[in-house]
Amino acid sequence: MAFTRKRQREQQLQLYSKERFSLLLLNLEEYYFEQHTAFHVQHQGSQEERKIRGSLKICSKSVIFEPDAISQPILKIPLRDCLKIGKHGENGANKHFAKAKSWGISLIFSQIYFIKEHNIVAPYKIERGKMEYVFELEVSGKVEDVVETLLQLHRASCLDKLGDQMAMITAILQSRLARTSFDKNRFQSVSEKLHMECKAEMVTPLVTNPGHVCITDTSLYFQPLNGYPKPVVQITLQDVRRIYKRRHGLMPLGLEVFCTDDDLCSDIYLKFYEPQDRDDLYFYIATYLEHHAAEHTAESYMLQWQRGHLSNYQYLLHLNNLADRSCNDLSQYPVFPWIISDYSSPELDLSNPATFRDLSKPVGALNAERLERLLTRYQEMPEPRFMYGSHYSSPGYVLFYLVRIAPEYMLCLQNGRFDNADRMFNSIAETWKNCLDGATDFKELIPEFYDEDVSFLVNSLKLDLGKRQGGQMVDDVDLPAWASSPQDFLQKNKDALESGYVSEHLHEWIDLIFGYKQKGSEAIGAHNVFHPLTYEGGVDLNSIEDPDEKVAMLTQILEFGQTPKQLFVTPHPRRITPKFKSLSQASSYNASLTDSPVSPGEESFEDLTEESRTLAWSNIAKLQLHEQYKIHKEAVTGIAVSCNGSSVFTTSQDSTLKMFSKESKMLQRSISFSNMALSSCLLLPGDTTVISSSWDNNVYFYSIAFGRRQDTLMGHDDAVSKICWHNDRLYSGSWDSTVKVWSGVPAEMPGTKRHQFDLLAELEHDVSVNTINLNAVSTLLVSGTKEGMVNIWDLTTATLLHQTSCHSGTVCDAAFSPDSRHILSTGVDGCLNVIDVQTGMLISSMASEEPQRCFVWDGNSVLSGSRSGELLVWDLLGAKVSERIQGHTGAVTCMWMNEQCSSIITGGEDRQIMFWKLQY
């Protein structure tokens, strides 16, 4: 569980330091500066004194004394409550302390807190009234320095304005940091080379710890100014798996480092004082990681989730991580949705849609009556307006859920108190009801509700959390009737999260929290508007000159909750079934290199199974060159293969169409239609007609049986770049900025008469069209232009569905995935882009060192042909090149794959065609 794992790490560090003390004993925005071994001098009787040994902690707003004996309470004296501070004997000390030595420190104050007596976590005990405590330092020579420090901090704490207090404390802190530097003796090796050093704070939930960051050629170090909880935190760069820039207080100052694949528990979270320091450190580590770890984007995770390679839970974790949500920052703790809405039935029916919460609405809009009241207030509110006065995620809400495993955090947040017993997390059903009906309660859930650790539901620490109005003590969380145990409750929550209903609708909730409905007019329409201070860019803290206003703003930002960083600005696509059924293409062919017929002697298309295709693609890196032939005088531009696999037809920039026999390994025919280059070719079913497109603006039909040109379609005003065919319709893309749809092109064209080609539709573009392709059933067409635009067209209505500008320069190739859910495009910019067909959203982009001119793909993996002649195998889900295969001596310009995915033919600028076989 997220918080449990985090807490375990902190407890391990506390064991290292052997202290009961933790930074959670400090106030919010307070710093721990130094500690001294000391004795608390207590008066017993008229002459007797008792000395309790311990550690005196000097903090920016308090003095804390931690006795060595755990039976004794920790003492916390707020500096603002101190009446006098000085060396013993200078404060008009109580006569009972007459024997206390001169190196004692005397504090006269009006209020003191007693904490963790017998090491029991409980609300702080408070004693009020004028009193004096004396502490003797073990090193007497430090008394004057400590007293001077306390007096300086006392002056800061007593300033009237919070802004002035913060400014003075910050100046003291920066002065201490400036007088110190990282101890180079802490390097792991004398051979380490220092790269940079700067000041920063280590961030843990609710608290930060200032110190020095140092990075060398092998390690990242953080040395706390106070040496707590250990002298140095060291991370070996070789162990780093991921790093993320973070917002802290809505400012670009954070950096989080992960050395494991755990998306919830990082190894260190640093907050810098200057964005440039953060960026420099990030760049250095990122440069180191380039060859050690793959970087994932929201789009790459989306693709994995869509295709079923990530569970709903895993995907939400990744999105939270990318959106700056961190377990180290309770104002930006990972947020998960309420899924179940039925907490009263004896049995949970996950097949009933009524069991689930409406994921298209924020929590505040689930109750229509409450929403109406909120909207009325919203309309009457002056600008800037907001619908909800509280957020769906805040430190208070997180600790509301986690108080049973994180009581010290709640005490820190609530100034030493637990919340009222009736307002605590007592019941799942009551909490859900309050989220539906409460005037100010709009909270979502946290990852723990979908994990395996039940400890946050059980009072295993036997905490005294108070007594409710009905007389019952707050203990374990009351579960719904359909949950037989905490384990059963979490399991059913997990089952609900991964259910079919949620998989179909989770994208709607993502739109609200991480997506395009988070801000602007879409947020207003979705009733999803929160206080401006919760949004990134809602306020510029650096522009606020009034220190009091600045502190107030920062406090509100940290305590009120923050909206996640926006990851998507267009509608999030739905999830799709990861396993797709093969669609028959017996009547669909085109010059696209992925939709060619199958050779007899191999399995027919109808007999192909998903397993056989999957097996072939899983071994795609095992391609071996079988044969190669140089049959053209210029670059090869298109490939088509006969049904029996014996004849290969190719087009070239040398203006010829050639027919090559695989059996005799000889060139059988060479046909020239004009003196200009041919750009693509396709073979109609029946193997009687080859169609070729040309740069002379025409499309040529060649009869194989009669051995002559049988027709010419003069349909464009500029070069025809690509042709496709399906069910008697021909599709032609051209540099004249159009794609045209023609009827009257039957599968078996008689060679004895000319045809009447009727123009059915003209799909107009703003610039030249370089490539086109059809989806499996030819209801959609994708076109790629010379200015980097990828267009998706609905062929049933001849309308443009989506237009995505995703390349800088010409789109080389574009094709649908076998299930028609995605489009892959390549361009001269070297990028491979994946686009969601439903939304037109760019969901993945990978950069290669050079343009990939052509490709075939199965939706998960890609085989592409590069400008240098290599064949590259890409793992789209892993966003990486998994294999490089040497092929042509020039660019690979076209590619064909049979339906079994076991045979491949490539054509190149080196004028060759190469025959490849899978060996497995």
Curated annotation (Swiss-Prot):
One of its GO terms (molecular function) is signaling adaptor activity. Residues 176-247 form the GRAM domain. The keyword Repeat applies. Residues 189-286 form the BEACH-type PH domain. One of its GO terms (biological process) is positive regulation of amide metabolic process. Keywords: Repeat, WD repeat. Couples the p55 TNF-receptor (TNF-R55 / TNFR1) to neutral sphingomyelinase (N-SMASE). Specifically binds to the N-smase activation domain of TNF-R55. May regulate ceramide production by N-SMASE. This is Protein FAN. It comes from Mus musculus.
